[in-house]
Amino acid sequence: MGKLTLLLLAILVWLQYSLWFGKNGIHDYTRVNDDVAAQQATNAKLKARNDQLFAEIDDLNGGQEALEERARNELSMTKPGETFYRLVPDASKRAQSAGQNNR
């Protein structure tokens, strides 16, 4: 009976070792779970960005407001009867910001 108990104990020790330290053990399991959680967070951010881009595409295809906004902001276009004003910072402020950028 002692040899059987010793054999079963040796098998139990081997199984525990492989569970904790072996390939596909607890450490690998926790690492993979962390990787999956990080990937799911990344996927959620990308899905939100895709949804935003699809909404912008739909707005550009169907609505004139987004097209008008882009024309105003990027091309500085105005409607008939409107006056365009460009605000230019003071020369002293420009010199200060240029001096800070050179550092």
Curated annotation (Swiss-Prot):
It is a single-pass type II membrane protein. GO terms for cellular component: cell division site; cell septum; plasma membrane. InterPro entries: Cell_div_FtsB, FtsL/DivIC. It is found in: Cell inner membrane. Residues 1-3 are cytoplasmic. One of its GO terms (biological process) is FtsZ-dependent cytokinesis. Residues 22-103 are periplasmic. Keywords: Cell cycle, Cell division, Cell inner membrane, Cell membrane, Coiled coil, Membrane, Transmembrane, Transmembrane helix. Residues 31-71 form a coiled coil. The chain crosses the membrane at residues 4-21. HAMAP family: FtsB. Belongs to the FtsB family. Part of a complex composed of FtsB, FtsL and FtsQ. Essential cell division protein. May link together the upstream cell division proteins, which are predominantly cytoplasmic, with the downstream cell division proteins, which are predominantly periplasmic. This is Cell division protein FtsB. It comes from Shigella boydii serotype 18 (strain CDC 3083-94 / BS512).
